[in-house]
């Protein structure tokens, strides 16, 4: 088993002070969690393998991403930084990488224009392009026989629908089919968030995480629902994810990154300590 990565995620929304990290349940009812640069430094010191910054209001409000927050963070933190939110063009990618990010995460723009993935990965390299896929369970399997039907933990059947604009708009796209297309187009990684689990503390959505991990060759970062180190463990063992992303458990001080890594190491999951 390859070394598993633990990645704190900072959902950032812009305010007068130049960025506030927020975390809500299913992207609504957002609670403030602190200054993004301070939190990034804290996670760096705790041994995070990477950081993800998502400007969660950017796509929705059509605002360009917060370059200054990226620059300040990149000056303080020396682990890989992925930035997403409102990235719609090659020029956006260029600006964010120039500001100090190592990778960009594309989501809504990739669904609207899949060739954007190919274009960006051709210019900057696949290793720089992470495609974020937000999905929701859809229990209407009767009328969706062309979709990838999976069995949920309770035996119910469902397919996973790709949603965009921060989870607000369903697309009709099947998550497994879309993920395969994204890989073909040149994305180097997939950041998979189940909206059914986001912020719930119920653990990762294992059926879809496992399916993508088995079907694709590129790394899958599991996201949405981590409440304790055991959830991270299940994401790696049952979900076969390459990396685990979490927000709430780190932001509100319930666990440090080191706590999670030590718990994983005690269960023989290879992590960098």
UniProtKB/Swiss-Prot annotation:
UniProt enzyme class: lyase
Enzyme Commission no: 4.3.2.10
Molecular functions (GO terms): imidazoleglycerol-phosphate synthase activity; lyase activity
Gene3D superfamilies assigned to the protein according to its UniProt record, in alphabetical order: Aldolase class I
Entry annotated with the keyword Amino-acid biosynthesis: yes
Pfam families, sorted: His_biosynth
Keywords: Amino-acid biosynthesis, Cytoplasm, Histidine biosynthesis, Lyase
Pathway connected to this protein: Amino-acid biosynthesis; L-histidine biosynthesis; L-histidine from 5-phospho-alpha-D-ribose 1-diphosphate: step 5/9
Matching HAMAP family: HisF
Family statement: Belongs to the HisA/HisF family.
Name of the protein in its database record: Imidazole glycerol phosphate synthase subunit HisF
Native organism: Methanococcoides burtonii (strain DSM 6242 / NBRC 107633 / OCM 468 / ACE-M)
Organism phylogeny: Archaea, Methanobacteriati, Methanobacteriota, Stenosarchaea group, Methanomicrobia
Gene that encodes it: hisF
């Amino acid at each position: 088993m390859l070394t598993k990565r633990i990645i704190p995620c900072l959902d950032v929304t812009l305010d007068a002070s130049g960025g506030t990290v927020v975390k809500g349940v299913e992207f609504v009812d957002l609670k403030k969690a602190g200054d993004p640069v301070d939190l990034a430094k804290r996670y760096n010191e705790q041994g995070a393998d990477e950081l993800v910054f998502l400007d969660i209001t950017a796509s929705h409000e059509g605002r360009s991403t917060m370059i200054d927050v990226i620059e300040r963070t990149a000056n303080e933190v020396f682990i890989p930084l992925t930035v997403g939110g409102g990235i719609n063009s090659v020029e956006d990618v260029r600006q964010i990488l120039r500001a100090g990010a190592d990778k960009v995460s594309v989501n809504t723009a990739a669904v609207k224009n899949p060739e954007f993935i190919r274009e960006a990965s051709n210019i900057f390299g696949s290793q720089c392009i992470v495609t974020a896929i937000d999905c929701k369970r859809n229990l209407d399997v009767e009328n969706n026989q062309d979709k990838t039907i999976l069995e949920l933990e309770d035996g119910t059947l469902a397919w996973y629908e790709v949603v965009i604009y921060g989870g607000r708009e369903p697309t009709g796209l099947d998550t497994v089919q879309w993920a395969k297309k994204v890989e073909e187009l040149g994305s180097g990684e997939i950041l998979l968030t189940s909206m059914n689990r986001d912020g719930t503390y119920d653990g990762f959505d294992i059926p879809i995480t496992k399916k993508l991990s088995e079907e694709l060759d590129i790394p899958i970062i599991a996201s949405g629902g981590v409440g304790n180190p055991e959830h991270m463990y299940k994401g790696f063992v049952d979900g076969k994810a390459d990396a685990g992303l979490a927000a709430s458990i780190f932001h509100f001080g319930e666990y440090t990154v080191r706590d999670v890594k030590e718990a994983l190491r005690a269960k023989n999951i290879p992590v960098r300590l």
